[in-house]
Amino acid sequence: MYGDLANKLILEAKRTQQLSQAGFNKQQLPVYQDELVRGILKEVGSLKKNVDYLREQQLTDQDNKVAQCQYVVAMLSMERNKRCLLAYQKMRSEMLDSMVWDNNGMEFSSAISNHPNLSSFDSSVLSHAEQEYLKEYAQLLTELKSGELSEIDLTGMLQPPSDVFIDVRVLKDAGQIETEYGVFNLIKDSQFFVRQSDVERLIQQGYLQKI
């Protein structure tokens, strides 16, 4: 039935969003649904052939109610498939954007094996187009941060902190961090009273939780 594949794709996108919002592995996307996407594109191609045929045969006039109904259904099905594909791609691109910003705009291709927060990132789950997008977006942000805006922390929180010092809980081991007020060993389930600006990035990356 027309639209079934697109519905499956949207359900996959919703599951991904829910897992991300719940805090489960924000640094990893699920596998790109290439088979579903190709199936939807094939369906769109078939629908377009039907639409073109009805137009060529001039069967869409008001006297032919059946053909007119077929034409409208095919057009609406194509439009819905298009919207579902765009929504799926937009969701994944926004998550990739967040990964780049959370990791300070570094090149993922060179950082995945060296950066502790990216050690679990598997680029094979991305489509080829997504891999290219991720690489170029990371490079763009790196160039932006190293130019005239190099002295501004573009990855910082937009809202000013309400408190200078905050209590935080460690959600996963992050090793030692050195601050102006001493060295903290971030072990899972431990708690600290720290200056918010010192741990802002770790909060964004999911290592710490403000309590």
Swiss-Prot record:
Entry's localization field: Nucleus
Pfam family, one: Sld5
Record GO cellular component, one term: GINS complex
GO biological process terms, semicolon-separated: DNA strand elongation involved in mitotic DNA replication
Source taxon at top rank: Eukaryota
UniProt keyword Nucleus, yes or no: yes
InterPro entries, A to Z: GINS_A, GINS_bundle-like_dom_sf, GINS_Psf1, PSF1_C
Major localization class: nucleus
Keywords: DNA replication, Nucleus
Assembly behavior: Component of the GINS complex which is a heterotetramer of SLD5, PSF1, PSF2 and PSF3.
Family, similarity comment: Belongs to the GINS1/PSF1 family.
Function noted in UniProt: The GINS complex plays an essential role in the initiation of DNA replication.
Protein name in UniProt: DNA replication complex GINS protein PSF1
Organism, scientific name: Kluyveromyces lactis (strain ATCC 8585 / CBS 2359 / DSM 70799 / NBRC 1267 / NRRL Y-1140 / WM37)
